[in-house]
């Protein structure tokens, strides 16, 4: 799935982003630069939290591997465990491994929530910056209302490829 849709998504997103940026620059270059000003912050945020997500998901895989290894050992030695009456000890080991997996899963979901919320904040911030800068440009009479409306309609075409590229790296 990744090899089929991945390169396609990257190419489409890059073309859409570059094309939209060219259109926005033609509508009003100052407003386009204001919209693009948040990109470095968004990319740094995405890079940092993408790394945290990868580490959290690796911890999840490690914890589930620990549980599977312990289960395999327990099942292969079930007669020995029963003969020595160690069922409670084995259940305790399983519960301990299960709790470690649960905690790593909670941590991963927390990081994922912060990451997705943060990306939402940055994309909303682009819209807010455009509205505020547009108001300033309207006040200075360097921007027409029709251009601001057109610009606002293109903003989603500007932020959607960024969100798609960032989610691709997840």
Please identify what each model-predicted range represents.
Residues 9, 21-29, 51-59, 85, ...:
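Transmembrane helix-loop junctions in multipass membrane proteins, especially transporters and channels
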Residues 23-37, 46, 111-170:
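Helix-loop-helix
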Residues 1-3, 7, 52-69, 73, ...:
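An intracellular "coupling" helix at the cytosolic face of ABC transporter transmembrane type-1 domains
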Residues 9, 13, 39-43, 120:
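Residue-level recognition of pore/gate-forming positions within transmembrane alpha-helices
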Residues 15-20, 131:
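Hydrophobic, membrane-inserted alpha-helices
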Residues 4, 12, 38, 96, ...:
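Phosphate-coordinating loops and pocket residues in cytosolic domains that bind phosphorylated ligands
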Residues 21, 71, 78, 134-135:
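Generic hydrophobic alpha-helical segments
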